[in-house]
C-alpha cells in the first residue's frame, strides 16, 4: 500500500532526527556492504563500465525510474570517475545508515541509488516506498530512504526534473544473483543480464590489475 505524502513526510522527518542523534556512536563493521561482499581482490580504478551498464530502468506513466546498486563489488566495475561519484554519494550517508543498522540490529545493508525523472509535460508524482526488490523468492521494501536531491520529500516532479534517493534494503538482497525490481505495476528482471556483465568486468579488472604489478 502506498504511504500518503502527508503520512510519509513526518515519519521520515522523525526518523532523520533520531538517526542524527544516534550517529555519534561507533560505526558497525561493514555497514555499507551486503552480507558476504568481498572487495579484497577487486581493486578500484580499473573498471570501464558506465552507470547505465549497471542500471535497471522502468517506465511508469511519465516517470522513468532508474535503479542501481551501490555495493562496492558492483560499482568498482565502473570507470574511475563513475566509481568515485557513486562511492562518494554512498559515503555521504554512511553515518545515517550505520545509525539505522545499530537501531534495527541488522548486520549490514544493501544500498541502492534510485532516480526518478519526469519525461512529459506537467507535474508527475512518485512514490518512494513503492520500489520492491525480489531476491531469492522474497520481496523486500526499503528499510529507509534518504533523499539525495532538494525536494525529494515532496514526491513530485516538474517536466524534465529529476529527484534521487539512497535506499537501504535488507542485506539479504544479494546483488550477485538475479533480482526482480518492481515499481508500482512495472517490473524488470534485467539485473539477471546485467550481473553477468558485471561478472565479466570483474574478471577483466583482475587481469588489468595483475598486468600493472
Residue ranges: model-predicted function:
Residues 19-28:
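C-terminal segment of classical bacterial N-terminal signal peptides
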Residues 2-15:
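Bacterial N-terminal signal peptides that target proteins for export
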Amino acid at each position: 500500500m502506498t504511504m500518503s505524502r502527508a503520512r510519509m513526510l513526518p515519519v521520515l522527518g522523525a526518523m532523520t532526527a533520531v538517526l542524527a542523534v544516534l550517529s555519534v556512536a561507533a560505526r558497525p563493521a561493514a555497514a555499507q556492504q551486503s552480507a558476504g561482499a568481498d572487495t579484497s581482490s577487486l581493486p578500484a580504478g580499473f573498471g570501464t563500465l558506465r552507470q547505465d551498464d549497471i542500471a535497471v530502468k522502468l517506465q511508469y506513466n511519465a516517470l522513468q525510474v532508474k535503479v542501481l546498486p551501490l555495493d562496492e563489488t558492483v560499482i568498482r566495475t565502473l570507470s574511475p570517475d563513475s566509481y568515485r561519484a557513486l562511492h562518494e554519494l554512498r559515503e555521504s550517508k554512511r553515518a545515517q545508515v550505520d545509525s539505522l543498522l545499530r537501531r534495527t540490529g541488522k548486520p549490514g545493508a544493501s544500498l541502492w541509488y534510485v532516480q526518478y525523472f519526469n519525461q512529459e509535460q506537467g507535474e508527475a508524482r512518485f512514490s518512494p516506498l513503492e520500489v520492491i526488490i525480489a531476491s531469492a523468492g522474497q520481496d523486500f521494501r526499503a528499510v529507509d530512504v534518504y533523499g539525495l536531491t532538494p525536494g525529494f520529500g515532496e514526491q513530485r516532479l516538474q517536466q524534465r526534473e529529476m529527484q534521487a534517493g539512497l535506499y537501504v534494503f535488507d542485506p539479504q538482497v544479494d546483488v550477485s544473483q538475479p533480482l526482480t525490481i518492481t515499481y508500482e505495476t512495472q517490473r524488470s528482471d534485467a539485473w539477471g543480464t546485467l550481473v553477468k556483465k558485471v561478472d565479466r568486468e570483474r574478471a577483466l579488472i583482475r587481469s588489468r590489475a595483475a598486468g600493472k604489478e
